[in-house]
């Protein structure tokens, strides 16, 4: 396992860009164990200290979008 670190200014920007309750759309998620198709929508729950954007997805999943790996876009 590896530890991820994120610069404070990047974390601040993520939290500003993806506040709790905003709606996002999945562009791409790199998770070989889950079916997470592009276009799926969800509501942001919070951004954690590592920059993971935790989302309640429309398929019932609560996977976090990982900054720098997965791609989401805000749609509201």
Predicted feature descriptions by range:
Residues 2-76:
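Basic/aromatic-rich interaction segments and small domains that mediate binding to polyanionic partners
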């Amino acid at each position: 396992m590896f530890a991820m670190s994120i610069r404070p200014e990047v974390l601040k920007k993520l939290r500003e860009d993806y506040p709790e309750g905003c709606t996002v759309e999945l562009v791409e998620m790199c998770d070989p164990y889950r079916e997470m198709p592009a276009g799926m929508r969800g509501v942001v729950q919070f951004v954690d200290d590592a920059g993971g954007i935790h989302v309640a997805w429309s398929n019932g999943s609560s996977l976090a979008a990982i900054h720098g790996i997965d791609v989401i876009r805000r749609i509201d």
